[in-house]
Regions:
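Acidic, mature catalytic/reactive cores of soluble proteins
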Residues: 1-172
Length: 173
């Protein structure tokens, strides 16, 4: 859902807006897909943006980052991994992209919007070693759910799952 106080024009698959701002003008554009209501004005948009930013700052401050010249890079990497976590289930997406070829112009395309068990484990181990263990705990719950451990029916783990725990056949890879 696209919400704004600008006049939007739709051109094919694109939404465009033009305006000339003068000092004191306030505009906002919000793109959302949440069940929560989108902001309806500049003040609501600014408040939501501030709260989101503050939430991310609080999360990164939980971590135990070494006093190292690369500390900022470790923090940025941790934030990137956190952004790939699907919080309703604890699944970690391999990436936020889809259909990237294994080689340029190649036929083998991989969809990285799934949770690949091996890759997720390595990534979450990184967060765990930085003291950000909640995400690892949530992922273990995700694994327990998809393996049937929570209802007593154990299933062998697949290579990957949908972020909601959906079983993915090889045709989707």
């Amino acid at each position: 859902r696209l919400t704004t106080n600008l006049r939007i024009g739709l051109e094919g698959h694109e939404a465009r807006a033009r305006t000339r701002l003068t000092e004191g003008d306030k505009v906002f554009v919000a793109l959302s897909w949440s069940k929560h209501p989108a902001p309806q004005n500049f003040e609501e948009a600014a408040d939501k943006m501030w709260k989101t930013s503050e939430s991310w700052r609080q999360w990164i401050n939980i971590g135990d980052f070494p006093d190292h010249p690369w500390r900022a890079y470790l923090q940025r990497s941790a934030l990137t991994l956190k952004g790939l976590v699907y919080s309703p289930t604890g699944a970690l997406l391999a990436a936020s992209s889809t259909s990237l070829p294994e080689t340029p112009q190649g036929e083998r395309n991989w969809d990285y919007r799934y949770s690949w068990i091996r890759d997720s484990t390595f990534a979450l181990w990184g967060l765990y070693t930085l003291g950000l263990d909640r995400e690892a705990d949530d992922f273990f719950s995700f694994i327990a759910d998809v393996s049937g451990a929570t209802n007593g029916e154990r299933h062998p783990l697949q290579v990957m799952y949908g972020v909601g725990g959906e079983q993915i056949g090889r045709a989707h890879v």
